[in-house]
């Protein structure tokens, strides 16, 4: 038994050193992406909710602009983060979190294609509205993984918020206005706000070094 513990000791120490050294850097990068994703797509979704509620109308060109507006700056931000960190050495913590985020992103892409094809072929908006519900559940799982790795209570609260949002959207799936407003609020409160907090915490930790 003692031999097993001794054999595991170097790996545990390596993980701890990697966590201390790379935590702020990986947290800042992820926070930047989450902040802008939540802000851009949250405002877009809330705008759709206001339109659906009859607040104002959009022309065809305005609707197209609103549909694609968040994507261009968001891709630019992702490209910037990838380019900035391209030569950075990645330890076990960064690789673990990156694998979690990347896996969720790939699953989200595949799910979007599947639900998009089904919604188009069946001419059913309800099928397409199931897509964000699944994405919210995935977000809950990703934030739970981050909570388990970093052992931070607030990450667990964000995870719980996403799971609550999943249930709320399921109940509102036939009430489009409420559905869009709740989803938009979740993107701002459970993605943009935590992303901003991650950047602030990373800056504070780096300032102590």
Placement of each model-derived feature along the sequence:
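Selected alpha-helical membrane-embedding segments in polytopic membrane proteins
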Residues: 25-114
């Amino acid at each position: 038994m003692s031999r097993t513990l001794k054999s595991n000791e170097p790996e545990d120490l390596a993980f701890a050193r990697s966590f201390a050294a790379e935590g702020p850097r990986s947290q800042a990068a992820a926070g930047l992406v989450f902040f802008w994703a939540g802000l851009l797509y949250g405002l877009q979704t809330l705008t759709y909710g206001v339109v659906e509620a009859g607040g104002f109308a959009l022309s065809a060109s305005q609707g197209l602009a609103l549909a694609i507006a968040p994507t261009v700056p968001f891709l630019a931000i992702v490209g910037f983060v990838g380019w900035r960190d391209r030569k950075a050495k990645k330890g076990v913590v960064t690789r673990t979190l990156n694998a979690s985020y990347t896996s969720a992103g790939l699953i989200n892409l595949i799910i979007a294609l599947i639900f998009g094809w089904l919604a188009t072929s069946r001419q059913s908006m309800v099928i397409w509205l199931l897509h964000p519900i699944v994405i919210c559940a995935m977000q809950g799982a990703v934030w739970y993984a981050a909570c388990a790795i970093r052992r931070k209570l607030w990450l667990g609260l964000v995870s719980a918020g996403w799971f609550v949002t999943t249930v709320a959207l399921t109940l509102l799936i036939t009430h489009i206005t409420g559905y869009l407003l709740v989803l938009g609020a979740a993107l701002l409160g459970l993605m943009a706000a935590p992303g901003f907090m991650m950047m602030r915490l990373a800056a504070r930790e780096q300032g102590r070094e």
